[in-house]
A protein has these predicted regions:
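Short alpha-helix boundary/capping and kink motifs at helix termini
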Residues: 1-71, 75, 81, 177-178, ...
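Generic structural "secondary-structure junction" signal
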Residues: 13-14, 20-25, 29-31, 55-60, ...
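Hydrophobic, Leu/Ile/Phe/Ala-enriched alpha-helical segments that form helix-helix packing faces
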Residues: 41-45, 91, 168
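A short beta-strand motif that forms part of the nucleic acid-binding face
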Residues: 72, 83-84, 205-207
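Short active-site loop/helix that positions an aromatic residue
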Residues: 76-93
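Short, polar/flexible loop-turn hinges at active-site or ligand-entry regions and domain interfaces
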Residues: 90-95, 210-214
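Extended charged low-complexity segments that act as oligomerization/scaffolding linkers
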Residues: 98-137
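Polyanionic (Asp/Glu-rich) segments that form extended negatively charged tracts
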Residues: 123-322
């Protein structure tokens, strides 16, 4: 394991790409988190502080000096991408191209977009690339769609772009260019790299006590990936199955559903936290996939109960108070 202080300029460089692994939680920073980050860094910029630290970035090195999985710090890293994308849009050339290279570089010969510096979870990446990195407008129709689906990560991305736009609109272009330069050259993170998924997994659990606490669903999902053995060829398949569960139930209601599922399986009162109650259940299962299959079946029944979708009149009447 290695740790070093690095400027944002060395983090968001043309040679390095980052991916959010499937076992990570989705983007969840709220408007207040973004306002605080912007306000704190702007205050340091105005005070001409020599350096300003914004926390740690813990990664697994998949390709030396080129590709990293983000274990901790993805909320800040994603938000930095939002900020630089909007700073790019707010300034003129040549600063626009300079900042654009930090988030979505282009081939200078063909003008085609290349691989983004950051890739989010599969479910969120298309929205992130189109509406954050490529600055495609988030129309009212798109906003209504993500609201109706209660798609929390996309709602957070959309809302936080609005926070950043409001913040930048109050400053002139010269100030924004100087602020962007300060962000790149005077703002630091502690950059930690490990080559081992097992080491990263231990760090992931230890770091749950810091920052935004992980939900029980996040921790249960993490245990499933641990049972799988980390970044195997099966991880994408497991991630897709979990995403289908999230979409069916809704991220905001997932903890509640998992509590009901545990009660229906064990038929005993919980004595520990929800994710601790799930640990022996996951360990006793044949595979993570068979365990998730059982949860998926339970989810379908749960949704029928929630929707009171039974033909039997007596059943509908008994479920109505729930």
């Amino acid at each position: 394991m290695e740790a070093a202080e690095r400027t944002i300029s060395k983090i968001l460089t043309e040679q390095i790409r980052y991916e959010i692994p499937p076992y990570q939680r989705p983007y969840s920073w709220e408007k207040g988190n973004v306002e605080q980050l912007l306000g704190d860094v702007w205050d340091a910029f105005e005070a001409d502080d020599e350096e300003y630290f914004i926390g740690s970035l813990i990664t697994i090195e998949r390709q030396k000096d080129e590709l990293y999985d983000v274990v901790d710090g993805q909320q800040r890293l994603t938000t930095l991408n939002l900020i630089f994308a909007r700073l790019r849009d707010a300034v003129s050339e040549p600063a626009k191209s300079t900042l654009g290279k930090r988030v979505l570089p282009k081939n200078e010969l063909t003008g085609e977009e290349e691989t983004p510096r950051l890739t989010l979870r599969q479910k969120d990446q298309s929205f992130f690339r189109r509406h954050v990195l490529a600055s495609e407008e988030i129309t009212e129709a798109i906003s209504r769609e993500i609201e109706s689906k209660q798609d929390a990560p996309k709602i957070r991305l959309s809302e936080n772009l609005g926070v950043i736009d409001h913040f930048l609109a109050q400053r002139d272009e010269k100030s924004l260019k100087l602020f962007a330069n300060y962000l790149l050259t005077k703002v630091y993170v502690v950059f930690v790299t490990t080559a081992s998924w097992q080491s990263a997994y231990r760090l992931f659990n230890v770091l749950n006590a810091r920052g935004m606490p992980l939900s029980n669903a996040d921790l249960i999902k993490n245990m499933l990936f641990a049972r799988l053995g980390g970044a195997s060829a099966k991880s994408e398949e497991l991630d897709e199955q979990w995403l289908q569960l999230e979409e069916a139930i809704g991220i905001e209601r997932l903890d509640q559903f998992l509590a009901h599922h545990r009660s229906s399986v064990t038929a005993i009162k919980a004595r520990k936290t929800l994710h601790e109650e799930y640990k022996p259940l996951i360990e006793a299962s044949d595979t993570p996939f068979s365990f998730l299959d059982g949860i998926t079946t339970s989810a379908r029944n749960y949704l029928r109960i929630q929707q009171n979708g039974f033909e039997d009149v007596a059943a509908r009447r008994s479920l109505r108070p729930l």
